[in-house]
C-alpha cells in the first residue's frame, strides 16, 4: 500500500491533474446521460405533457382571482349561495324530446357528484406526445398514434379516461353515470381548474338510458368565450340557414366532491346537443346516413382501398356500413385524382353542393376559423346514404364570430374575404371554388344569409336577450369572469388600438356588438363590389 502511494507521488503533477479532470468529466457525462434517460422515460410516459399542461393552465388561471371561499359540509342550507340564485327551476322529467330540452334560453340545473376516488380516476392520463409539434408551415399535428384521441390534447400526449359519478339534471338523478373530461383548447386552458369541460354518457353501461332522447350530454365550460353565447348564436345561425347543426341550452353546474364540497357552483356551461344516431334520424327523417368527425388538413385525400387507413382520420361517430366506407374511399379517389374537367362534371354526384355552399357561407359570414376553414378539425361530415353525397356540419363554435386569435387581427377577421374564405391552402375548397356552378350557388347563399339572417338589429337583440338569461349564473363566477362578460356584451366599444399579443390574457375582450356591426358592413361591401376582403395567405406557426 505504501509502495502504491510512493508510485502515485512520483507521477508528474500534470498527469495527476489530467486524471482528475477526466474523472470530473466522466461524472458529468454520466449525470447528463442519466438526465437524458430520465427525460426519455418521462417523455414516453407522458409526464412531460402533464407537467407542461399544468404550467400553461396555471398561467391562464392566474389571471383570475382565486375562487370564492365555499361553505363546508354542514353549513345551513339557507346560507348556501345556490339558494339565492334567481335562475329558473326547470323540471327535466316533464321534457319529452330533444327539441324541448335544447332551447337556447333554457338554463338547466346540473349537479355532478364524485367520490375522491372517482374524481382521481377522471384526471388526465399521460402518453407519448407527438415529436413534430410545431411545423414551420403552421400545420401543427392533428393526430398522435400513441394517444387515445385526436386533436391538440392527443398530440400533447394527454388522455381523458372515463370515470363514474352521480348526475342530476333538472331534478332527474342518475347513478353510476360514465363521465370524462372533453375538448382540446378548453380542456388545456382549464387543466388545473375545477370548472372543467365534461362529457356525460348516461347510456354507457346502461343501454337505453337517456334524458329527453339524449344519452350523451356535452357540458362545455366556456373558458375561451367571455360572451358565453358564441356557440348558442352560431349554431342557431346555421340551423336557420338550413345547415344540419346541433341545438344548445345552458347549464348552471354544481360540483359535489367527496367530503370537500356538497354543491359548489362551477358557473355557466353551454349544453351542446350530441351528434349521434338520434340526431341523424331526426335531421334525415330516418333514412340511411353516416356521420364522421374528420381530423386532417387533406380532406378526401386518396389513401388507398384499405379502410384502416381512413378510420382513425375520419373517426366515425355512428356505426358505418361497408357501403358507407366504400363511398368515402371512392370520393377520396375522385377528389384526389380527377382532372378539373372531370371534377366539375361529376362533383354533384359526391357532394350536396347547396348544403356545402350554405355551410361555407355561414362559416365565412361569422368568421369561424377554429375549424374547417383553417385547421382541419372541429367540424363533422355526413353521408346521405341513398343519395351517396357528403355534406358538412359545424362543431365547436366557442371562438366563432371573429374571435379566434390565431388567424389575422380582429380588424382583419371583421373584413375577411368571402370570395376566398379559407386560410392558406385548402385542396377541397380550392377545387370546389374552381367550379362555376358551385361559386354561383355559394354567392346566392351568402346573399340570402346577409339579407335574412346576418342582420345587425336582429343579432344585437339576440345578444341582449341571451345576456339577460345567463347573467345570473355568470355573476356567481370570479370578478375577472364577470368583468370580461360585461365587456364582451356591452353595446359600445373602444376605438381601434394596437393589436395585442394573442397570448396576452389581458388583451381587450372581443366585442360581440362590434363584430356584428363591422362584419355586416364588410359583407355588404364585398357583395356590392366595393371591397375585396382580407385573404389569409399563410398560417401562423403554432405557438408564435
What is the meaning of each model-derived region?
Residues 184-186, 190, 284-298, 397, ...:
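Short, His- and charge-rich active-site/binding loops that engage polyanionic ligands
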Residues 12-33:
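N-terminal Sec-pathway targeting helices
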Residues 32-44, 367-368:
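Short hydrophobic alpha-helical membrane-anchoring segments
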Residues 86-90, 99-100, 105-108, 118-127, ...:
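Middle-to-C-terminal accessory/interaction subdomains
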Residues 42-236:
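Conserved NTP-binding catalytic cores of kinases and kinase-like/nucleotidyltransferase enzymes
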Residues 182, 256, 382-384:
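Short beta-strand micro-motifs enriched in acidic
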Residues 2-15:
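Juxtamembrane low-complexity tails/linkers enriched in Ser/Thr-Pro and polybasic
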Residues 197-207, 211-216, 220-223, 227-228, ...:
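Internal "kinase-insert"/substrate-recognition segments embedded within catalytic cores
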Amino acid at each position: 500500500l505504501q509502495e502504491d502511494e510512493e508510485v502515485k507521488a512520483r507521477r508528474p503533477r500534470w498527469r495527476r491533474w489530467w486524471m482528475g479532470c477526466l474523472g470530473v468529466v466522466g461524472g458529468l457525462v454520466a449525470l447528463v446521460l442519466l438526465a437524458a434517460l430520465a427525460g426519455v422515460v418521462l417523455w414516453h410516459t407522458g409526464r412531460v405533457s402533464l407537467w407542461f399542461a399544468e404550467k400553461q393552465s396555471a398561467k391562464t388561471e392566474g389571471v383570475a382571482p382565486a375562487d370564492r371561499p365555499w361553505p363546508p359540509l354542514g353549513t345551513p342550507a339557507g346560507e348556501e349561495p345556490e339558494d339565492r340564485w334567481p335562475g329558473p327551476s326547470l323540471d327535466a322529467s316533464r321534457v319529452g324530446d330533444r327539441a324541448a330540452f335544447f332551447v337556447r334560453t333554457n338554463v338547466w340545473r346540473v349537479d355532478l357528484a364524485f367520490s375522491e376516488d372517482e374524481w382521481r380516476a377522471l384526471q388526465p392520463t399521460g402518453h407519448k406526445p407527438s415529436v413534430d409539434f410545431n411545423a414551420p408551415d403552421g400545420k401543427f399535428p392533428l393526430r398522435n398514434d400513441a394517444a387515445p384521441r385526436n386533436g391538440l390534447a392527443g398530440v400533447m400526449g394527454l388522455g381523458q379516461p372515463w370515470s363514474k359519478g352521480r348526475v342530476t339534471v333538472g331534478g332527474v338523478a342518475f347513478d353510476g353515470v360514465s363521465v370524462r373530461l372533453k375538448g382540446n383548447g378548453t380542456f388545456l386552458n382549464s387543466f388545473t381548474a375545477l370548472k372543467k369541460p365534461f362529457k356525460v354518457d348516461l347510456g354507457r353501461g346502461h343501454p337505453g338510458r337517456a334524458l329527453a332522447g339524449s344519452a350523451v350530454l356535452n357540458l362545455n365550460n366556456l373558458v375561451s368565450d367571455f360572451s358565453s353565447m358564441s356557440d348558442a348564436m352560431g349554431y342557431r345561425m346555421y340551423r336557420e340557414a338550413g345547415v344540419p347543426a346541433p341545438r344548445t341550452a345552458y347549464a348552471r353546474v354544481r360540483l359535489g366532491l367527496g367530503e370537500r364540497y356538497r354543491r359548489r357552483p362551477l358557473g355557466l356551461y353551454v349544453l351542446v346537443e350530441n351528434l349521434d344516431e338520434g340526431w341523424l334520424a331526426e335531421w334525415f327523417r330516418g333514412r340511411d346516413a353516416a356521420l364522421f368527425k374528420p381530423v386532417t388538413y387533406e380532406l378526401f385525400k386518396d389513401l388507398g382501398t384499405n379502410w384502416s387507413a381512413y378510420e382513425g382520420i375520419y373517426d366515425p361517430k355512428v356505426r358505418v356500413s361497408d357501403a358507407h366506407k366504400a363511398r368515402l374511399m371512392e370520393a377520396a379517389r375522385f377528389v384526389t385524382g380527377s382532372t378539373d374537367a372531370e371534377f366539375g362534371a361529376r362533383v354533384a354526384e359526391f357532394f350536396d353542393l347547396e348544403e356545402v355552399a350554405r355551410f361555407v357561407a355561414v362559416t365565412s359570414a361569422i368568421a369561424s376559423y377554429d375549424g374547417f376553414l383553417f385547421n382541419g378539425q372541429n367540424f363533422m361530415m355526413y353521408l346521405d346514404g341513398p343519395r351517396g353525397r357528403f355534406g358538412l356540419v359545424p362543431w365547436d363554435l366557442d371562438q366563432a364570430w371573429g374571435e379566434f386569435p390565431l388567424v389575422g387581427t380582429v380588424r382583419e377577421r371583421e373584413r375577411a374575404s368571402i370570395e376566398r374564405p379559407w386560410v392558406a391552402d385548402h385542396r377541397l375548397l380550392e377545387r370546389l371554388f374552381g367550379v362555376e356552378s358551385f361559386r354561383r350557388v355559394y354567392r346566392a347563399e351568402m346573399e340570402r344569409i346577409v339579407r335574412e339572417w346576418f342582420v345587425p338589429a336582429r343579432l344585437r337583440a339576440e345578444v341582449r336577450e341571451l345576456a339577460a338569461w345567463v347573467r345570473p349564473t355568470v355573476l356567481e363566477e370570479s370578478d375577472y369572469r364577470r368583468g370580461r362578460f360585461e365587456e364582451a356584451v356591452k353595446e359600445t366599444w373602444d376605438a381601434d388600438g394596437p393589436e395585442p399579443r394573442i397570448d396576452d390574457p389581458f388583451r381587450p375582450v372581443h366585442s360581440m356588438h362590434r363584430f356584428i356591426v363591422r362584419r355586416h358592413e364588410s359583407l355588404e361591401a364585398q357583395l356590392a363590389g366595393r371591397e375585396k376582403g382580407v385573404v389569409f395567405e399563410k398560417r401562423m406557426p403554432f405557438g408564435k
